[in-house]
C-alpha cells in the first residue's frame, strides 16, 4: 500500500523521491502542491499520509519504532515559524500568520477520519498555546489526545531542541479531554544512544565547520551544505521514534 507525501519545497520533494527509491522510507507518491490545494479525494487509497513531509523523517521514525508501512497513520509537522522564538523579529503573527496551516490540515482530518495522527511543534509557551487550539479542534471530532515535551539530547543528540510531540487517536468513543503535557526524559532509552564520534560530527556541523567532516574539493563541500539544508528543517528521528513507541504502547494497552 502506498504512502502519500505532501511537500511544497521542490528540493525536499526530490529528497523524498530519492529516499523512496532507495527504500529508506515507505514507498509512495510525492505531491508538491500546497496543502491548501489538496482535497480529501486526493488521499483515497493511501495507507499513510505525511503532510509538511520535509525529507520524510516521520516515515523513517515510524519504521524505527516498529510501525509497519502497511499500518495506517497520518503525520504532520506544521510550520513552526508563527510560534517560534525566531518569530520575534516579525512580531509573532501567531494564529494570524499565513503559515499557520493546522486549520487546513484539520479540514482533511475531519473529512478523511484517519485512525491515528502524530504531529509536533516547537516546545515553547507559544507552542503550548498552539497545542491547546489543536486539541480543541481534534477533540471536537472525538479524538483522544496526548502530548509530551521531549528533548533531542535525551535521544542522544548533542543539542537540546525541545519539541512538543502529540498523538490523536480516533478509536475511542465520545469526547475525552487530552492528557496533561509532560516533560519526558529519553536518556534511559539505551538503543538510541549516540556515540561520541557522532556527537562530535554533529557539533561541528551545527557550528558550520565542515573542514573535519568532509573530504574533497569546494564543489563537493557545497553539495554537503545543500544536504545539511535538508537536515536543518527535519525532526530528530530517534526523538520521534521514542515518542511513537510510547504512544503506541499507551494506545494498545489502554
PLM feature spans:
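Conserved active-site and SAM-binding loop architecture
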Residues: 1-254
